[in-house]
Amino acid sequence: MARVKRGNVARKRRNKILRLARGFRGGNGTLFRTANQRVMKALCNAYRDRRRRKRDFRRLWIARINAAARLNGVSYSRLMGGLKKADVRLNRKMLAQLAVVDPGSFTNVVAAAKS
């Protein structure tokens, strides 16, 4: 069998990992084995948190809508139920933005949900 020399392939593979690890502290950014572990962990965290971000934002929007709704004398669940009955098609992101940026308009939306 022919001898396989891994010069270029191995160096490229290592440099790819070290490039991804740039900016990591200490040996985590310069030593291949620890850098490889840190990069794998970072990629796992990134994958997990891309999904978690969607949940976190939804929770934030709901908290903001609930706070603004209670200032107008109605709970979050009653507001959302009323909006569904009134056929108001505003999603949670839009409602939260309204509550923060334009409380007057949000009050009008709450009034529509109450009636």
Swiss-Prot record:
One of its GO terms (biological process) is translation. GO terms for cellular component: ribonucleoprotein complex; ribosome. CDD domains: Ribosomal_L20. GO terms for molecular function: rRNA binding; structural constituent of ribosome. Keywords: Ribonucleoprotein, Ribosomal protein, RNA-binding, rRNA-binding. Gene3D superfamilies: 6.10.160.10, Ribosomal protein L20 (1.10.1900.20). PROSITE patterns: RIBOSOMAL_L20 (PS00937). Pfam families: Ribosomal_L20. InterPro entries: Ribosomal_bL20, RIBOSOMAL_L20_CS, Ribosomal_protein_bL20_C. Binds directly to 23S ribosomal RNA and is necessary for the in vitro assembly process of the 50S ribosomal subunit. It is not involved in the protein synthesizing functions of that subunit. NCBIfam families: rplT_bact. Belongs to the bacterial ribosomal protein bL20 family. This is Large ribosomal subunit protein bL20. The gene is rplT.
